[in-house]
């Protein structure tokens, strides 16, 4: 991997390698873009095949956070950390204390959070060394479980997509096929049920399915059958890449709007659903409620204020679909354009984030 060529191609700012022999820490912090503010992104712990795979993942995820934060209207850039190791057996307190000191050394250019393989408890340990961490225990003034807030954002985004497809944002009487009934999807189902939608659900966890059936009168189907259901809206809320060659030809929905990450297996599948006339709410725009919520901690968390910001996902999806129509491009490209246009507007007056008295961090 020609590292500097790759960083130059996608305009990365900084890559930080963190090592602590005593604790076993091997971490890579990638900072993609700080035009809008300090880089916010979680810390992932994973058993990577090799160091190059870890570097590539950190870079890819950091760039994704730039777009997610920008499209969400946050005054934050994009970053990400990967820690090389098995989260089930390689963790120790010293590791996260050492990592916290590395974050502190960046003086606010990067703020971390929980991600795959890390926990709230890990964030609390990091917090012993630095304030540049979010998603810590509620006792320290954090926002707590993000699932209900993420679900509310998906619900708002789904209504905006429904308005584009059906001429009204009312979901009453609409049939919605929800794939996955985990914490976020369960809360989404609650909102949909309260508005009078008809729910079809599936999950590999039979208990989760049964709970949705009992609580919301949902109809359960086998996991492989969810794509072919007669429904108005398909809501992918489990694994990624469920919009692919096999599933697209089965879809009968007019709208795709759900909480899952990386819903398109390949970008060409986004082109396909656009050509089919399906209204698509891009994943990183519609599921941004979690990051919007956690970002509010930087101001001193206020649940009412955070929820008000999450309501804005409705308008964000509207803008994405307007750009899609304006420029004649698929929604996934329109989401990228929304983020890029916002960054470019700010770039004219600001090139790189440095800690000073006029950033989000000065309000902590």
From Swiss-Prot:
Binding residues annotated for NAD(+), in chain numbering: 180-186
Active site (UniProt): 80
The UniProt record lists the keyword NAD: yes
Alphabetical UniProt keywords: Branched-chain amino acid catabolism, NAD, Oxidoreductase
Pathway participation: Amino-acid degradation; L-leucine degradation; 4-methyl-2-oxopentanoate from L-leucine (dehydrogenase route): step 1/1
UniProt xrefs under InterPro entries: Aminoacid_DH-like_N_sf, Glu/Leu/Phe/Val/Trp_DH, Glu/Leu/Phe/Val/Trp_DH_C, Glu/Leu/Phe/Val/Trp_DH_dimer, Glu/Leu/Phe/Val_DH_AS, Glu/Phe/Leu/Val/Trp_DH_bac/arc, NAD(P)-bd_dom_sf
E.C. numbers: 1.4.1.9
Superkingdom classification of source: Bacteria
S-S pairs: none
UniProt GO BP: L-leucine catabolic process
Catalytically driven reaction(s): L-leucine + NAD(+) + H2O = 4-methyl-2-oxopentanoate + NH4(+) + NADH + H(+)
Pfam family name, one: ELFV_dehydrog_N
Coiled coil: none
Gene Ontology molecular function, alphabetical: L-leucine dehydrogenase activity
Its job: Catalyzes the reversible deamination of L-leucine to 4-methyl-2-oxopentanoate.
Protein family (similarity comment): Belongs to the Glu/Leu/Phe/Val dehydrogenases family.
Protein name: Leucine dehydrogenase
Species: Bacillus subtilis (strain 168)
Lineage, uppermost ranks: Bacteria, Bacillati, Bacillota, Bacilli, Bacillales
Gene that this polypeptide is encoded by: yqiT
